[in-house]
């Protein structure tokens, strides 16, 4: 073994009720970055052995929807919204996404990296071991590529697995005002082929919304992405019901995200597919929305629900995934178990890693979060204390720098 962790109380999240209940003290043997052994043996030969002294171990948390890479600051919009100006009106006035686009275009890769790392550090401190990062604030070929390169480079600066997603269809850039179809063709003819060729992203996302792109434009991007061997994700049904979730499910998309205005037909479409419903409570909270996602209907149809931070400067400036777990429980009435599965097992499925991450299971990647807590429900219950002891990413152990337990 390369690493043996002993006296660990495991929350494996394997199928069944017992996957959520902490185990009696066990050992985890890690070899070549994967979980090789789960059992009670504490004397296995290992290059490195660490006694966890009864600490709780969960799968590493997975943030499956973020906009981490951007430049600029939009706290002024926060003040505007508190004065009653709706998000849609801010966007129509050239604010919103486009204000971040201008700042991001002006920033170099080095400047973007410098501004992104503190946000990433916040997520890592909340137990995140894998993170999805979208483009979408460049909206030109050069700037979208720049964002994806910065996203891919994050794993060179921090111990984390990064999954980049192309979101060129995030907003209509000013150069294409009044020509949304032309911009969609530009994405399909210029951006997607290059991103696929250079392997800068594994999936393509579209903001399918009344202030974004319509159903036909979304499908044009989806079809092009599939043609180039890329997976599908969608921002759907956040502010209205356009049918984007059902379209995403029809293309066997990895996930449909936001979904506050999802109708029963959309839920049934998800149930017929493998597409995950990703909840973004941070944006719901920050925008003071009132339309709740159809949680009970999703439960009834057995649709897997993921939870993500949606870290972004305009609608969810939160860099703590456990805070999102708390919000999902308090605002959306998820159980703490559903919340934990939402940032592990189901989040892994939302990124295409259902068979390799998101559970503590032999043969899976050794991605773990080690906590100084009594029960997994504590992760959703209490926010703001230093609970993370260490993370393990692809078998590499890293103790949290602010943890006082030696």
Curated annotation (Swiss-Prot):
It holds the Pfam family Amidohydro_1. One of its GO terms (cellular component) is cytoplasm. It comes from the Bacteria. It catalyses: 4-imidazolone-5-propanoate + H2O = N-formimidoyl-L-glutamate. Binds 1 zinc or iron ion per subunit. Zn(2+) binds at residues 65, 67, 235, 310. Keywords: Cytoplasm, Histidine metabolism, Hydrolase, Iron, Metal-binding, Zinc. One of its GO terms (biological process) is L-histidine catabolic process to glutamate and formamide. Its EC number is 3.5.2.7. It is found in: Cytoplasm. One of its GO terms (molecular function) is iron ion binding. Fe(3+) binds at residues 65, 67, 235, 310. Pathway: Amino-acid degradation; L-histidine degradation into L-glutamate; N-formimidoyl-L-glutamate from L-histidine: step 3/3. It is an enzyme of class 3 (hydrolase). InterPro entries: Amidohydro-rel, HutI, Metal-dep_hydrolase_composite, Metal_Hydrolase. 4-imidazolone-5-propanoate binds at residues 74, 137, 170, 238, 315. N-formimidoyl-L-glutamate binds at residues 137, 312, 314. Belongs to the metallo-dependent hydrolases superfamily. HutI family. HAMAP family: HutI. Catalyzes the hydrolytic cleavage of the carbon-nitrogen bond in imidazolone-5-propanoate to yield N-formimidoyl-L-glutamate. It is the third step in the universal histidine degradation pathway. This is Imidazolonepropionase.
């Amino acid at each position: 073994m390369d690493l043996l962790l002993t006296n660990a109380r495991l929350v494996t999240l394997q199928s069944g009720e017992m996957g959520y209940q902490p185990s009696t003290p066990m050992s985890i043997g890690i070899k070549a970055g994967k979980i090789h052994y789960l059992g009670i043996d504490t004397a296995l030969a290992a290059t490195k052995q660490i006694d966890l002294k009864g600490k709780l171990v969960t799968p590493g948390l997975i943030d499956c929807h973020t906009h981490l890479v951007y430049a600029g600051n939009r706290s002024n919009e926060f003040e505007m919204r508190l004065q009653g100006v709706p998000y849609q009106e801010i966007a129509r006035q050239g604010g919103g996404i486009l204000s971040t686009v201008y700042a991001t275009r002006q920033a170099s890769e080095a400047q973007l990296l410098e501004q992104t790392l503190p946000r990433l550090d916040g997520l890592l401190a909340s137990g995140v071991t894998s993170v999805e990062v979208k483009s979408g604030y460049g909206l030109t070929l050069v700037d979208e590529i720049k964002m994806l390169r910065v996203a891919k480079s994050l794993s060179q600066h921090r111990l984390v697995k990064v999954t980049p997603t192309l979101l060129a269809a995030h907003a209509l850039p000013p150069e294409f005002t009044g020509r949304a179809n032309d911009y969609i063709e530009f994405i399909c003819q210029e951006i997607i082929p290059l991103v696929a060729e250079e392997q800068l992203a594994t999936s393509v996302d579209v903001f399918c919304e009344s202030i974004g792109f319509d159903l036909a434009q979304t499908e044009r991007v989806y079809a092009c992405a599939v043609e180039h061997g890329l997976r599908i994700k969608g921002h759907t049904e956040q502010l209205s019901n356009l049918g984007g979730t059902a379209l995403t499910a029809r293309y066997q998309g990895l996930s449909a995200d936001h979904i506050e205005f999802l109708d029963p037909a959309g839920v049934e479409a998800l149930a017929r597919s493998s597409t995950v419903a990703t909840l973004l409570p941070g944006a719901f909270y920050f925008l003071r929305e009132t339309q709740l996602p159809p949680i009970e209907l999703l439960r009834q149809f057995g649709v897997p629900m993921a939870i993500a931070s949606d870290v972004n400067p305009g609608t969810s400036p939160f860099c703590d995934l456990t805070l999102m777990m708390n919000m999902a429980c308090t605002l959306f009435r998820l159980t703490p178990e559903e919340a934990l599965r939402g940032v592990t097992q189901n989040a892994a499925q939302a990124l295409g890693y259902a068979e390799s991450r998101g559970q503590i299971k032999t043969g899976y990647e050794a991605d773990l979060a080690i906590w100084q807590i009594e029960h997994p429900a504590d992760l959703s219950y209490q926010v703001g204390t230093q609970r993370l002891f260490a993370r393990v990413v692809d078998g590499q152990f890293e103790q949290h720098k602010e943890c006082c337990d030696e």
